[in-house]
């Protein structure tokens, strides 16, 4: 949802996901998150596992470990929520009552931000989101705070040699929004910003180039949940051409050697809704639904010699692991081709550990990843801890009060680069594992 709201902008130069933090929502009472910024003192696997941008190194892959229910999935869900808030800001700013009755929009607007539930004081406090990205070697930091459905604060800064404030908002009212530098052209239109809408989203909607560039990068982030095996792969016209299918088959055949080809049929339905004829220059919200049918072709044999092929419904006859693999492959290759960031929840779900290692390795290889794509994934697979930097690994831990914290492996004392990290993790040295002592 949201195709056509924020203008397409060519992706220039080096683009990098740096960090995402969230506070007072889900299990996150305090502001917490991860960063891909590598620590200068850690030299292990520096060349293989990091990119260098303007003298700083950033990790290609970040792994998030933790017990079930510790907040790993909630962390990725918070990023998705931030993206939806950006889209909903433009929808709300359109002041179009018919648009608000569209089922998908109505459902999203009826799902307010939930504050941390296990501290009664948090209900009356703001929920906070912050994201950092590098575009054309400039670090942009965008944050906002929301309470009772209204934007209380909003801040956008950029930094190359020094930090410059581009947006500073100190209340829900548009009169309390200060715009500078690349956002100055939006000053004469700032009155369209509602109390429940983000200023940066509205500036992008009204064709401010800087706002569009930043939000396009944030909206390009894909979040995949590997547990949703029942869903069809996320296919469209661009990722089902002959070349793309060949790329998928190369890896699918590892799981199913009888597989010879895939047939993908797409049926698209697009609903277009005019946002506003006056204020928003006839911009449209496009809700696109694609029905996907996948047939797999398999070799048939007689006396161990191939004699033909048989066509089978992919989702019915393939294993859960093979289905999950096809579900994630398009997103992986799109990220690698575009140099964008992919977030995967439960990356090992249904896949053999060697396959997970193989797919993750695509992001570490200069040959398959020349465009600086990044992978952020949650996992329980300890085999992935082999050959990683200590600052690539994060642990989520939930305390007795229901509060989730996230801590980098490199922040733990007495952890050396040659330690058996997997063994220490399973022994509970870093926490972030189920507490089974009370059952003994």
Model segments located where?
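Switch/communication elements of ASCE P-loop NTPase nucleotide-binding domains
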Residues: 2-90, 302-436
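Extended helical coiled-coil dimerization/tether regions that scaffold
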Residues: 4, 10, 23, 231-317, ...
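Coil-to-beta-strand transition motifs
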Residues: 15, 29, 124-126, 137-139, ...
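Short, well-ordered strand-loop elements centered on a beta-strand within folded domains, enriched
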Residues: 17, 140-162, 174-181, 270-297, ...
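Short acidic, glycine-rich loop/turn motifs
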Residues: 22, 131-137, 158, 298-305, ...
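Conserved P-loop NTP-binding catalytic core
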Residues: 55-57, 63, 67, 76-141, ...
